[in-house]
């Protein structure tokens, strides 16, 4: 690095300023050329790194301080990177789902760790339990023993069907897994 600084100190700043617009233009192109990333490592930070250069004083602040080399890095590359390689890197090319919000090493949106959390997981389990109960009652009631086809199962030990209690009927009728007073058990 010190060798590069010495070499760049001998070059006039007017020669270093024209490559910056060229790099911005090539960084905006869609060809994906690797010209954008070397601008961070190459001459542009070195050209503005001169403490006596009046153009570097505009970008860095106080001309005598050599410490803040990071502001030129942050102020120069974002024009080519903001419209070019970074957006493409976070977009559909790197992410298989075409969404750049998760970043480059992002997981797919649904199998990720946040989807199977305790609140959503318990919600899905609570939602599936009545379905399992209904499917079990469908299997039990549609496949009765061959010797006794018309026997109603006594479900008085099960909870009362909410819909039957409110409306007086249930759309599942005798296939419902819950207790219908007077229909699939003794009346209350």
Curated annotation (Swiss-Prot):
GO terms for molecular function: RNA binding; zinc ion binding. InterPro entries: PRR3, Znf_CCCH, Znf_CCCH_sf. Keywords: Metal-binding, Repeat, Zinc, Zinc-finger. Coiled coil: none annotated. Residues 83-96 have a biased composition (Low complexity). This is Proline-rich protein 3. Transmembrane segments: none annotated. PANTHER family: PROLINE-RICH PROTEIN 3 (PTHR47398), PROLINE-RICH PROTEIN 3-RELATED (PTHR47398:SF1). Pfam families: zf-CCCH. Residues 35-46, 69-82 have a biased composition (Pro residues). A zinc finger (C3H1-type) spans 155-183. Residues 1-157 are annotated as: Disordered. Residues 145-157 have a biased composition (Basic and acidic residues).
């Amino acid at each position: 690095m010190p060798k590069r600084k010495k070499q760049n100190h001998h070059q006039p700043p007017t020669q270093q300023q024209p490559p910056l617009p060229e790099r911005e233009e090539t960084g905006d192109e869609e060809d994906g050329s690797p010209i954008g990333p070397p601008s961070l490592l190459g001459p542009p930070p070195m050209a503005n790194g001169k403490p006596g250069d009046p153009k570097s004083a505009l970008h860095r602040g106080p001309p005598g301080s050599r410490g803040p080399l990071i502001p030129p890095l942050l102020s120069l590359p974002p024009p080519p990177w903001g419209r070019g390689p970074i957006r493409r890197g976070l977009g559909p090319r790197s992410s298989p789902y075409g969404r750049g919000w998760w970043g480059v090493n992002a997981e797919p949106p649904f199998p990720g760790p946040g989807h199977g959390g305790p609140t959503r997981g318990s919600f899905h389990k609570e939602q599936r339990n009545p379905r399992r109960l209904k499917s079990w009652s469908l299997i039990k009631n549609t496949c009765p023993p061959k010797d006794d086809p018309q026997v109603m199962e006594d479900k008085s030990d099960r909870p009362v069907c909410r819909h039957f209690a409110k409306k007086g009927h249930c759309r599942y009728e005798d296939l419902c897994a819950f207790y219908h007073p007077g229909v699939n058990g003794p009346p209350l």
